[in-house]
Amino acid sequence: MLSATEVRHSHRRRRSPYSDKQHYQEYLLQRIEGYKNSIGRDELLRLGDEAASELQATSEGQFVLTEVLMLESVDRLIVKRLSLRPYSRWRKQFLRLRAAQRTPNHWGIDALCPLSALLPRIEPEDSALVVGTGAAPMTFLLAAHDAAVTFLADNLGCVERVESRMAEEALASLFESYVTQLEHPLPLFMSFLKGFDLVVLDPGVLKGMSAANRGELVRDLQQRSRPGGIHVILPSSKALSPNILRPLYEGWTPEEELKRRRRADSKGPHGLVLCKPTCPPDTA
């Protein structure tokens, strides 16, 4: 993830964005795998038999059938069966769609949302952790900017809806989601979730918690951020203002983007955008 200074002084990215060809291959793969998962085993076997017959008819005994050839042939049959668009036609629609997906209002997000100001800083495959049902729309916006997004919520229905729309919008290639209780630090089996460039928190998940439990969960999320990582606290909960959480971020610095937006627009709710220290205070 680029710093604000890097964005101001250079438009050069450290990582190249995905090419349209890569996005097209992901589009095909998602549709093919979705179709395979939607049909029964018998139908899948019949599809395999059809692919084998087609290969044998066209090969004239020139090669031995292999698993790779069979899989490729099955995939081609599925592409034909689903009438998936060729690259040239797909690209025209994709460019328009992706341009729309990268705007906050496409997802019903306020243009003054604290995350919006950070979008120019996001690079392909930056890792983002989004926590809470009230932050669900942020998952789509981040995925549209090619971030690798992990979504956590304690509501199974919400997680399933996000997963479904990610697939519908062709944004699921770098997306993961988990259902977990958010009343304490994350469970041990989620210890692999760490090193995030960006964490987006719906403070609604902290509503009703004791001050001690609230602090434990926030500190746990802080530890999962890389040095210099960003935390965005959304103004999504009427019951819990983001500013109430500010004392839990001792040593973290407010980002300039939100300061400027606050000066430009004094009305309406504001969130918090905070940057983790690049080194512990005692070694600074």
Segments (PLM) and residue ranges:
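Conserved beta-strand signature within the Rossmann-like core of class I S-adenosyl-L-methionine
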Residues: P227-S237
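N-terminal auxiliary segments of SAM/dcSAM-dependent transferases
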Residues: M1-Y87
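Class I S-adenosyl-L-methionine
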Residues: A239-A284
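A short glycine-rich, Lys/Arg-flanked "PGG" loop and its adjoining helix->strand segment in the class I
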Residues: N213-P227
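Conserved SAM-binding loop of SAM-dependent methyltransferases across substrates and taxa
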Residues: A135-A147
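Conserved class I S-adenosyl-L-methionine
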Residues: P124-G134
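A short SAM/SAH-binding and catalytic strip from SAM-dependent methyltransferases
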Residues: K194-N213
